[in-house]
Regions:
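Single transmembrane alpha-helix segments in multi-pass membrane proteins
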Residues: 115-118, 163-213, 220, 229-246, ...
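Short loop segments and helix-boundary regions at transmembrane helix junctions
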Residues: 122-132, 185-191, 230-287, 321-323, ...
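Cytosolic-side transmembrane-helix boundaries in multi-pass membrane proteins
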Residues: 1-28, 32, 38-89, 108-149, ...
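Helix-loop-helix "hairpin" substructures at the membrane interface of multi-pass membrane proteins
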Residues: 298-375, 398-399, 403
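Pore- or pathway-lining transmembrane helices of multi-pass membrane proteins that form conduits
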Residues: 174, 240-265, 274-276, 308, ...
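Transmembrane helix-bundle core of multi-pass membrane transporters
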Residues: 86-97, 257-320, 375, 423-430, ...
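Inter-helical junctions in multi-pass inner-membrane proteins, predominant
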Residues: 25-26, 32, 156-160, 165, ...
Length: 460
């Protein structure tokens, strides 16, 4: 029963949160995609001439939140005992304490909130109006609280909510940087499978340079260089010599893994002074960092997190509200049309691929100087591929990819926390949480979003 409930719970979490990401992306379709639809209508319509993106978005609108409400009810049937939530950090302006709540009551209450929000979303969908953001937020938050109450029911410890959320944000940092790198590359028409190698290269170079200079700040300046080098190799073989970009990306990942492994075993193992565990200082924003719950999570972080906020905000605006963004998207949607109006497609793709590599390399620094760890072989552990999944689930948009990355980070954080508090959920189920979430998300949503029309297509 516990295993079945866990699977249903995870499916509900994934589909509820990602449905909103997909719907938002489809509702905000940009002018470049409109031009591409006019130029190549067969790519975007089915046999009857119906826009497939609109069909997918409509389906998600109508089902959004329904499974979450039903799954919350099932969890309430299996919940026994109480759950204690720790809501306070030591530096908060005021302490909220650690209330002990009846697990079944919490689940039923949140199920009611989810059901009400679902009704609003369904009504707005029926009238072909945009679903309000607050409804999607309530569905996501309500279901997360229900899942935590169910998982912690009858456990020996407390649910450290602030710790879980802080850990989720930290774990999502390299995923966000990686997904932004993927967005820039693929929006300009280049498939960037080499994100894993760029993250690993950034982690390696950041650790070595920081150790050599005894300064972690220098490390985050060096890390993007590794990402740019990998990106330029991808541009050389994938764009200049027209080798299949997916194959080149995979080969580069293997190359970086082998090269960093060789350097680690040959030089770093015998010279510990070049591989020290240096950490960037935590920077607290005055007053904001002392707000209960959200303050420690959002405003007591390292510079890498604050740069991540800025990168998402700037890219969200520049990608759709600037001349640079229009040129970039034109190269990814219809490079021939872009060339016709005087845009150098090759130069645009190479330059933006280098920018993407710099972002991914900076994200790789999180594994070493951002976390206070020394470099280890393959320490990125496939995060580059998960970042690609976040990019797809976010419909190639910065805010959508941020939400998907946070979801994956939250799943990993929960998997790390539940065994510590003595949760009654099977340890086998707990260890599977991050992978189940990734598989469910990709399987459920990857066919319902559209990639840039000319991604992976060499030009000229």
């Amino acid at each position: 029963m516990a295993s079945l409930g866990a699977g249903q719970a995870l499916a509900g979490v994934v589909e509820g949160l990602l449905a909103h990401l997909l719907v938002t992306a489809q509702d905000a379709d940009d002018e470049c995609s409109t031009a591409a639809k006019a130029a190549v209508p067969s790519l975007f319509t089915n046999e009857s001439g119906t826009d497939v993106a609109l069909v997918a978005a409509s389906e998600q609108r109508r089902t959004m939140g329904a499974e979450e409400a039903g799954t919350s009810g099932l969890m309430a049937l299996g919940a026994r005992g109480s759950t204690t939530f720790d809501l306070t950090a030591s530096s908060d302006l005021f302490r909220l304490g650690a209330p002990e709540l009846n697990a079944r009551l919490v689940i039923l209450t949140t199920a009611g909130i989810v059901a009400a929000s679902t009704a609003v979303a369904f009504d707005r969908s029926r009238r072909r109006r945009r679903i309000p953001t607050w409804a999607a937020v309530l569905i996501g938050i309500g279901f997360v609280l229900a899942f935590l109450a169910w998982a912690g029911a009858g456990s020996r410890g407390v649910i450290p909510l602030v710790t879980i959320l802080s850990s989720a944000l930290g774990l999502s940092v390299p995923l966000v940087y990686g997904s932004l790198a993927g967005i820039i590359g693929e929006r300009s028409g280049t498939i960037n499978i080499a994100i894993e190698g760029q993250l690993l290269g950034g982690a390696f170079l950041g650790a070595v340079v920081a150790s050599a200079c005894s300064n972690p700040w220098v490390g985050i300046l060096a890390a993007p260089v590794a990402g740019v080098l990998v990106a330029l190799l991808l541009a050389l073989f994938g764009l200049r010599y027209r080798v299949n970009q997916i194959v080149v990306g995979v080969v580069l990942n293997v190359l970086v893994s082998g090269l960093t492994g060789f350097l680690f075993s040959t030089f770093l193992s015998s010279s510990p002074s070049l591989n020290r565990a240096l950490r960037l200082p935590t920077l607290a924003v005055p007053l904001l960092s002392r707000i209960p719950i959200i303050g420690p999570v959002l405003f007591r972080q390292t510079i890498l997190v604050y740069l991540m906020y800025a990168a998402v905000a700037v890219l969200s605006v520049m990608l759709f509200r600037s001349r640079w963004g229009l040129r970039l998207r034109a190269c990814g949607e219809h490079p021939k049309a872009a060339d016709t109006v005087g845009i150098n497609v090759m130069r645009t793709r190479v330059a933006n691929l280098a920018l993407a590599g710099a972002l991914a390399g900076l994200g790789g620094a999180f594994f070493t100087v951002g976390s206070g760890l020394s470099f280890e072989n393959d320490m990125t552990a496939g995060n580059g591929y998960i970042a690609l999944a976040a990019m797809i689930l976010g419909a190639w948009r910065p805010l959508g990819s941020l939400g998907a990355a946070l979801l994956f980070g939250f799943a990993t954080s929960v998997a790390q926390t539940l065994p510590v508090i003595g949760s009654s959920v099977s340890p086998d189920i707990i260890s599977m949480i991050p992978y189940i979430v990734t598989i469910l998300a990709v399987a459920g949503f990857v066919g319902k979003v559209r990639a840039p029309a000319a991604e992976g297509v060499p030009y000229p």
